[in-house]
Design a protein with these regions (language model features):
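A short, well-structured beta->alpha microelement
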Residues: 18-27, 77-100, 105
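Short beta-strand/turn micro-motifs composed of small residues
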Residues: 66-67, 109, 149, 203
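Residues immediately N-terminal to the Walker A/P-loop in ABC ATPase nucleotide-binding domains
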Residues: 32
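AAA+/P-loop NTPase substrate/partner-engagement loops
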Residues: 61-79, 90
Length: 219
């Protein structure tokens, strides 16, 4: 155990800096110069709440929202998003330069597995993968990314995100066990019993650690 807290909400900016989420100045990520999160779980598990908590640490950075969901999520009521129109015309023209022209930013791809238009879905997946691959210090600015999904095993849309995002956020006690084991096997944790936790954040590259409901723990 590295750190014990009463709840995830009590983890401070200083804690995040000490264990690698952000640097000591509070804005720039330590590892790889940017942050990338894959957040997966069923409806109502806490994906939006977790996303909002992460974004709230970076109040001065631009935030783009990519989603096909029309209803406004209450968890995002305090987040000022620039919502991107989910059309072929917009997504075909959108570049990484467009996203970073005003400075460092966040791109949130919310429930990407719900998009039914095959053309839009393909364009969005291409953009999402491009950001993960090339969004680090693009043109002098950085694109941080959060990808949320209902499924841990929708590899057609999220394979690249799963394999390349530095952080996974999972909700073990609300996730199908077989999906959870398949995901954890990728980092050698398939035998770990995480079922008692509501939410686990795993930093899946060096240094390997996870933030559970009550602890930050070295793996």
């Amino acid at each position: 155990m590295i750190l014990a807290v009463n709840s995830f909400d009590e983890i401070t900016r200083e804690d995040l800096a000490e264990y690698g989420l952000i640097n000591s100045r509070g804005l720039l990520p330590v590892y790889g110069e940017r942050l990338s999160f894959f957040i997966a779980g069923p409806p109502g598990c806490g994906k939006s709440v977790t996303t909002a908590q992460i974004l709230s640490l970076f109040p001065d950075q631009i935030k783009y929202l990519f989603t096909d969901i029309k209803e406004k999520d209450r968890a995002f009521q305090d987040i000022e998003f620039r919502r991107v129109r989910m059309t072929k015309e917009v997504l075909e023209k959108l570049t990484l330069d467009d996203l970073t022209k005003e400075g460092d930013c966040w791109c949130v791809f919310d429930d990407v597995d719900k998009i039914r238009n095959p053309t839009v879905s393909k364009l969005l997946t291409t953009l999402m993968d491009n950001i993960i691959a090339n969004g680090r210090s693009h043109g002098g600015n950085t694109i941080n990314i959060i990808v949320t999904s209902h499924s841990l095993s929708d590899y057609k849309r999220t394979k690249y995100s799963i394999e390349n995002c530095d952080y996974w956020v999972i909700f073990p006690n609300k996730t199908i066990k077989s999906q959870l084991i398949t995901l954890l096997k990728k980092i050698g944790l398939e035998k770990a019993d995480l079922s008692r936790y509501n939410r686990v954040i795993i930093h899946r590259s060096t240094p390997l650690f996870m933030i559970t409901d009550l602890f930050i723990t070295e793996i």
